[in-house]
Amino acid sequence: MAGKKLKAGILGYGGMGHCHASAYANQKDCELIAVADTVPSQLNSDKAELNLGGFEQAAGSKLRKYNSFEEMVKHEELDFIDICIPTDFHAEFAIKALKLGIPTFSEKPMARTLKQADAMIAAAEASGTPLMIGQCLRFWPAYEYLKDAYDSGKFGKLLRLSMQRISALPRGYKMWFREGARSGGALLDMHIHDTDLVLHMLGMPEAVMTFGCTHHTGAIDDAITNYIYSGGPAVSAETSWSHGPFSMSFIAVFEKATLEAKGMMQELSIYRLDQKIETVKLGEEGGHAREIAYFAKCLKAKKPFARCEPFSTRETIRLALAEERSARTGKKVRL
């Protein structure tokens, strides 16, 4: 297997499916050979709408296409499956794949509920089949730089971290994003990126205090969370499914410098007292291509996914649901 590319199949060919498909273009260890979707208009389209202010296009003319998960796994010898279907189906189809012994890479969030996340882990362990969740900020160069700065202490102690992630209200097939019971609203679908980064970099906070409101979906669609760590740092993250274009950003205040990244984060600014601004070029490759590359590399080498273990992404769900409870009750929630 060392010299061959792993063969991947995508389940779900809407916005994220097309996003993932384009991320296979220059992969060294894997290639996309097939896609499956129950919706003909999505399956046969060469582009799909994302909640990033545009459309994602994938070169899909050479891909074999199937109308269901069952058809694809019956006719293809897949080395792994890449799940890009709506959140409330993640667990069901991940478990089906794992029980068949098919290594599984799934879009975030891991699942709609903690019970579903636990069932996914149990299925992976029972079958001895690898499972990884695509929490892409762990692989996004700007956030990798931030975590390295924190871990190394190169700029001194982290004093404050503020993150923001905002987009227009997404739609999806039959407007599924707008059903809070399915998508979890902005908090579980989009804000969970920043929730995961907080957990990945700083560990589980002692408590969260979230100020938020329901808006379009019945779930929490606008929120700001304070993640409470005794002795610091001061950490907050803001999210909104509002009316404007997509944007993401962070400001990290260290003792010796402040880091800032925004937009699609192809560069990062470093501010130091009484010094010129330093700009770090990070390149155009985002987290989706990099997380798939990591998954395939580990899978080929038969190594665990140390940077993104299933239990760690299960804990991200636990943290996000604590934020939801805080927003709904107006009270601090301890973890």
Where are these regions (language model features)?
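C-terminal helix-rich "cap/oligomerization" subdomain common to oxidoreductases
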Residues: 1-2, 41, 80-82, 118, ...
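N-terminal Rossmann-like dinucleotide-binding module
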Residues: 1-58
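Predominantly a Rossmann-like dinucleotide-binding segment in NAD(P)-dependent oxidoreductases
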Residues: 16, 130, 137-211, 216, ...
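Active-site loop of classical SDR/Rossmann-like NAD(P)-dependent oxidoreductases
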Residues: 19, 281-293, 308
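Beta-loop-alpha module in the N-terminal Rossmann-like domain of NAD(P)-dependent dehydrogenases
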Residues: 20, 57, 61-123
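Short glycine/proline- and charge-enriched loop/turn segments
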Residues: 101, 174-182, 273-278
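Hydrophobic residues in well-ordered beta-strands that form the structural core
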Residues: 106, 131-133, 237, 261
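Contiguous beta-strand/loop segments that form the cofactor/metal-binding neighborhood of enzyme cores
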Residues: 189, 195-267, 292-304, 323
